Amino acid sequence: MGHRVLVYVGALFLILFTIFPSSSALISSPDANPPYPKAISDLKESIVKGLGFQSEEVKVSGFDIRDALVGHSVSYEFDLEIDNKVLPFKLLEDVNRWEYVDLPIFQVEQPSENGLVPMRNKKTSSDDVLPVLAPFQLSGPMELWIQDANNMRLSLPYDVDAGVLKKVILADGAVVTVKGARSVSLRHPIDLPLPLNQSSNEFASGLLSLAEQLRRASTDQESPVLSLRIVGPTSLASTSQSPDNKLKLKRLAPGLVELSSMSKDKRSLSTIGANAMTTVLTPREFTTMWPITSINGSNANLLGFEKLLTSVLGPKAQEKGSFKVLKAKVAAQTFMKIGFGIEKKLKEADVEGLSFPEWRTKPETMRMHFEVLAKVDGENVIPENVMRVDPIPLEDTIAQNVITGNVTMSKLPIIESPPSPFTL
């Protein structure tokens, strides 16, 4: 008897395990409804609110990270004060190439089978995907405040171990090449005199004259020296590899050094890019712009900035006076381009003002397609521009009987074409 009971109990457990093989089978597969990454989810909510929709009214589709395009560009931000009015400007270079890149913010942590999120031993670093500015040259006198550059290399032209640098003072005549910087910004506002001495349309002569006056003011002991903040540089190097043109290092304090030129009278020319040539404006004066001596007056961006400044100043550009630069920042940015769609149910009030033919069914839902250009800032994605797109153009096809009013061919008027000598 006891043996039969054990057989029945064993058979019952076998049936139960066959029907319910595991408790995890009651949990829906994560691949069936893949969750959005937190950055994309926050981006979706901010865009829906920015468009004026409520989350309950619309159905949002898209935002598939597999279709996201990633590109790098350079942004320019300026705040000018003219006649006690602050005018902010934000310019962005065109992205040359869009790619499918799996950024760290696109990754979603999936819970394990026991429902617990695995603990990460080390946070994934995104330094490998951070964009950097092209190498550029800076000339003294000025001071550089270094940020996020613990492993910065100092070459004068030979490598020098100066520890972790926080501040570098460039003496008059010292020129260094900065590589790997993520952004460069102005630390203090500066006053620039007017008028703009514009003499040629092929050169940014107005900005060059402003830069020259600013350089002369920086050499004055009574005027404050120009101060810049550089984020994330990987190296500061002498522009010349010759030992006769090397820079002299002077340690002033922990994290503070001064670089001065051994041959102050000699001008170091730009060596960035084999095709780059320095344009001579006069036999004795080069058109390189201080303090960024790696660009000259024929630079396309510099010409664009001068035209923008001239249009903003208006008649004041030719009058005596001054204006302030409160903020100036140049940064390498990562941008993302992704598409999405919004579907909204229409009410009677939404369709009343629209005229539809009698044969056409009035729409019940409205579908709109958008494309968003967003900036990747650390772990966040900030929308910059949302543009509506029409992926498929709509065309109305009307039957012939609808156009002719359902009239038979026998009742249509006979129209004879004019005779032609080539007709048989």
Swiss-Prot record:
Induction of expression: Highly induced during unfolded protein response (UPR), also called endoplasmic reticulum (ER) stress response, in a bZIP60-dependent manner. Induced by tunicamycin, an ER stress inducer inhibiting N-linked glycosylation (at protein level). Accumulates in response to dithiothreitol (DTT) and azetidine-2-carboxylate (AZC), ER stress inducers disturbing disulfide bonds formation and acting as a proline analog, respectively.
Glycan-linked positions: 197, 296, 406
Knockout consequences: Normal growth in standard conditions, but altered pollen surface structure with pollen grains adhering to each other.
Signal peptide bounds: 1-25
GO annotation terms (biological process): endoplasmic reticulum unfolded protein response; pollen development; pollen wall assembly
Tissues in which the protein is found: Restricted to pollen grains at high levels.
UniProt keywords, alphabetically: Endoplasmic reticulum, Glycoprotein, Signal, Unfolded protein response
Annotated Gene Ontology cellular component terms: endoplasmic reticulum
InterPro entries, sorted: TUNICAMYCIN_INDUCED_1 (IPR053283)
Localization, UniProt: Endoplasmic reticulum
Protein role: Involved in the regulation of pollen surface morphology, probably by modulating the secretion of proteins and/or lipids during pollen development.
PANTHER family, alphabetized: PROTEIN TUNICAMYCIN INDUCED 1, TUNICAMYCIN INDUCED PROTEIN
Name of the protein in question: Protein TUNICAMYCIN INDUCED 1
